[in-house]
Amino acid sequence: MIPNSSSSSILSLLVLLLFSTSSSWATNSIHEDFLNCLSIYKSSFPIPIYTSKNSSFNTLFRSSARNLRFLSPNSTQKPEFIITPTLESHVQTTVVCSKKHGLDLKVRSGGHDVEGLSYVSDSPYVMIDLVDFRNITVNVKNATAWIQAGSSLGEVYYKVGNESKNTLGFPAGFCPTVGVGGHISGGGFGSLVRKYGLASDQVIDARIVTVNGEILNKETMGKDLYWAIRGGGANNFGVLLSWKVKLVPVTPIVTVATIDRTLEQGATNLVHKWQFVADRLHEDVYIGLTMVTANTSRAGEKTVVAQFSFLFLGNTDRLLQIMEESFPELGLKRNDTTEMSWVESHVYFYRRGQPIEFLWDRDHLTKSFLKVKSDYVREPISKLGLEGIWKRYVGGDSPAMLWTPFGGRMNQISEFESPYPHRAGNIYNIMYVGNWLNENESEKQLNWMRSFYSYMGRYVSKNPRSAYLNYKDLDLGVNDNNVSEYIRYLKARSWGRKYFKNNFEKLVKVKSMVDPDNFFKNKQSIPPIRSWGKELEAINIVI
């Protein structure tokens, strides 16, 4: 990626805008003031802007918002403006003008924020939609890439695989429509997590717009902010423009497989054994586990289906040998496996049977009402415990659990290396997914999810019960803006330490330095304490 040459040239003008008074525009409303503020650059740097007067406004707003819970006409306040930047200067100007005229700012890269925090607000707001901010520049020789924040994971996978002739990859999530900006800034893991760690572990540079409209990179932002955006949620500190990442070696041919087992076929014993194997296998082997429910042959009776999904960086012969040595009970056979490229494996896991070009399709995802929760498991669950889980699980309406094994590279990285702390000692992550199509079922579905999550508490991490930032869950707690900043911080620790453990206080420190007035905020954003030094010292918290 080549940095935008206009960025530094307009910075001084942006600073003047930020600190000048709104009366200079001689307008009668914040709406007009904001438009006038943007219009200064219209002739030289046209800023794509949409208001409710545009016929495409509603379509654009809903286009990449994935969760119908936050698209109800009665529950969602729409933005005053939608900005679709194509230049870095567009983002700079939008940040400065939004702050100047008292408008909240939301930034949407892929729309997969499961609590809608990237595209809804309780206050008048501007939304930056990065749908047209998607340049990807791959350097095969150096095994690096500059990726703009609006790019989807599928676009990254396709381009990296195509340009490297299937010799390079990027370790990140399974869903190809997820936006890179938010995914990497929260950690990001998928089928290469055991081999290479998180997506955020591959970051070697970044560009971000600060609250004052300045563009910073790794060298100019300083080590604390650079640390914070790689797993602490970049939207807490600014608007992430682009990442520079390391690309990782992958074998030209990988092996994939999927095996389904019901309770009647011995799933309980296999899931129990999986807990002792999946995080200890050779790091080239990934075996993810998905649990769903299915009807049995008996009317009204359900069972649990455990689906074991394999990715192996190598050929079938070697995978069969490893499985025979480590997990023969699963019974993996040659005809269960398929050899393909690493890029093709992403189509296989997500929408089997589609052509590889499917990874470029950002619009295929069916919208639904959605609730997600998460856990980390540090001790294997007993067979008796699993049986208790199944009894409650079949009471849900088509729930899903995704168990992602760790170990390997994840055990080798310190929990303080980045804000993401869930490293050595965690056997696997659990993602709980509730998915429904009828809004009238929302209360029932949410109550079941919360009840099941409560039951699972006995089997998962404790003190704190940890959670994954990219699976945001407002049930864990929200910011209280009606109290002092110190009390707000104390309340935020209830959920902040679940996501970040002992890294939460350092994130508060960074937030307090770079955004002391809390412009970049949402219901679960990092709270600043402008006088954090004295107050944290008073309760003997060492940052």
UniProtKB/Swiss-Prot annotation:
Asked if Amino-acid biosynthesis is a keyword of the record, the answer is no
- What does the record say about PTM? The FAD cofactor is bound via a bicovalent 6-S-cysteinyl, 8alpha-N1-histidyl FAD linkage.
Record's cofactor remark:
Binds 1 FAD per subunit in a bicovalent manner.
Q: Which domain of life is it from?
A: Eukaryota
Disulfide bond annotation, renumbered to this chain: C37-C97
Q: Which EC number(s) does UniProt give? A: 1.3.3.8
- Named cofactor requirement(s): FAD
- Enzyme group, top EC level? oxidoreductase
Tell me the PROSITE patterns matching this sequence: FAD_PCMH
Query: In its UniProt entry, what is this protein called?
Result: Tetrahydroberberine oxidase
Organism of provenance: Argemone mexicana
